[in-house]
Structure formats: structure tokens, C-alpha cells
């Protein structure tokens, strides 16, 4: 998704759970501009996942198997909790 705009990402951060809306939206606003391309791809990947999985990673303490995705989860939890 190389042509995805911040406005499109902001819209995709709106989920079915208020907690996810806040965490994802806050990371986008605080960290997106300074994120490297790998972290940006991981964030776009994260937005494609079902809400229960995202909640398990961000709130439930579980981790995705991919190291890059896990690093993004750690970054969101560290900077947006």
C-alpha cells in the first residue's frame, strides 16, 4: 500500500473497540512520520488484521510471530499506553 495517505490510515484506525481506536490512532499521530518503511509496512499489515487479534496483541500481551510485527506492537504499547 505505498500510496496510502495518512487520512486513509486514520480512517482504518477506527475499529470496533474504543481501546483499539485510541491506541492505533495515537501511534499514527505520534510515530508515523518518523517511522521507517518497515515499521510503516507493519502498521499497514496490523490494520488488516481482525480486531480480536489486534486486541490480543495490544491489550492481552500476546505477540505476533513475525519479529517486525512484534517490534511494532512493542512500540505501540510503549508509546501509546
Regions found by a protein language model. Give the residues of each.
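Positively charged, polar, low-complexity stretches
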Residues: 2-81
Amino acid at each position: 500500500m505505498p500510496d496510502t495517505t495518512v487520512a486513509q490510515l486514520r480512517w482504518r484506525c477506527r475499529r470496533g473497540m474504543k481501546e483499539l481506536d485510541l491506541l492505533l490512532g495515537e501511534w499514527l499521530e505520534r510515530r508515523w512520520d518518523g517511522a521507517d518503511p518497515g515499521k510503516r509496512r507493519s502498521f499497514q499489515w496490523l490494520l488488516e488484521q481482525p480486531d480480536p487479534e489486534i486486541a490480543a496483541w495490544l491489550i492481552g500481551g500476546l505477540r505476533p510471530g513475525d519479529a517486525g510485527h512484534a517490534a511494532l506492537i512493542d512500540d505501540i504499547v510503549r508509546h501509546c499506553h
